Amino acid sequence: MNVPRETIAAIATAQGRGGVGIIRVSGPLAGKAAEAIIGRTLKPRFAHYGPFVDGTGQVLDEGIALYFPGPNSFTGEDVLELQGHGGPIVLDMLLQRCLQLGSRLARPGEFSERAFLNDKLDLAQAEAIADLIEASSAQAARNALRSLQGAFSRRVDNLTEKLISLRIYVEAAIDFPEEEIDFLADGHVLNMLDDVRAELSTVLREAGQGALLRDGMTVVIAGRPNAGKSSLLNALAGREAAIVTEIAGTTRDVLREHIHIDGMPLHVVDTAGLRDTQDQVEMIGVQRALKAIGEADRILLVVDATAPEAADPFALWPEFLEQRPDPSKVTLIRNKADLSGDPINLQTSVDGHVTISLSARSGGEGLELLREHLKACMGYEQTSESSFSARRRHLEALRHASDSLEHGRAQLTLAGAGELLAEDLRQAQQALGEITGAFSSDDLLGRIFSSFCIGK
């Protein structure tokens, strides 16, 4: 790859005051900077304590200096780390000294970008650094660390190797049709293809779970007017986020509240009550509610347990089921259990439907059941040593690869079209390569690394 030769420098610790502050330098001038600031040649990978001096010999600070010659460093280049006191003025003076010695100020994420360009880590691992820093729960941090250590990349690389093997068989059958063994016709290729599809499906499911832990789950509260949707939002948020009255149709727009349950991020959306109406403003609210339902990761379908139609709420709203055809993502909330006399509990039906009876306003009875249920939906405490962190772009790439394999299988089974299957396999491999950076445009790399902290 085209690795830049400029030397870069930046403050690597968070803004503000602290006990320790770190300046990081990477590039061909790092060794020269070390000698100028410390006053002597540093032994590689040893901690050297002493004063940090400016161009006139005046002491700027004192602390520990570490020198890592490339390629045995984080970036793969010569790297210098100066660990001094964490005052912003002191750190800025030390940074200015590095810039005077020929370094330039690093862009956000440029150290990680250079590590990627020097093959010290792949793109998924580089992104995991930012995910680890921004983790909002212990579970998300553990997943990000596993991705940084290569758990996700190994799964993708294994899929890629299987795709390459499959492509070899397909290309051989196309290029040498006169051979006695026809891999396309004897079922060997189809079996290999189905094996890759099954493994890809597993990785996609696990990546989806990892993305929820990283980005948070979008939970939409839906139901008829006056079922207690806004009361449920307030109970989950722990504050009066929505206006609650006895008047049906009080909520006319989509309300969004960001909450955490044991550190797990949730984006809770309260919607207008679903009903036929002639009110233009309320109609817009209903349309927005249906749109939110279609985009949700989890839907809390709230019904008034005291109403006679609460016995079979799904039969009431065909438009609801049209927006969310996957019933596995719907949790039925029987609200107002304090008035109906329903016991506070969580029940799972034979077909997997979960129903929770609670009271959103009566001291939040049953709310803890709902919180635990939402945590379970996000995969809280259900991850294994192989689980990993993932991003939305990773999911898009995995889905693209999956779609290509599905299309290729149809071409093979319906038309025996080996050439078209070969192209679909190529596209699937390229989609997987976008995850680790084997196939990545400069624009994509720029967007990814610009989201990092300066000094990372």
UniProtKB/Swiss-Prot annotation:
Function: Exhibits a very high intrinsic GTPase hydrolysis rate. Involved in the addition of a carboxymethylaminomethyl (cmnm) group at the wobble position (U34) of certain tRNAs, forming tRNA-cmnm(5)s(2)U34.
Protein encoded by which gene: mnmE
Organism phylogeny: Bacteria, Pseudomonadati, Pseudomonadota, Gammaproteobacteria, Pseudomonadales
GO cellular component terms given for this protein: cytosol
Source superkingdom: Bacteria
Annotated TrmE-type G domain residues: 216-379
Keywords attached to this entry: Cytoplasm, GTP-binding, Hydrolase, Magnesium, Metal-binding, Nucleotide-binding, Potassium, tRNA processing
Cofactor note: Binds 1 potassium ion per subunit.
The name this protein goes by in its record: tRNA modification GTPase MnmE
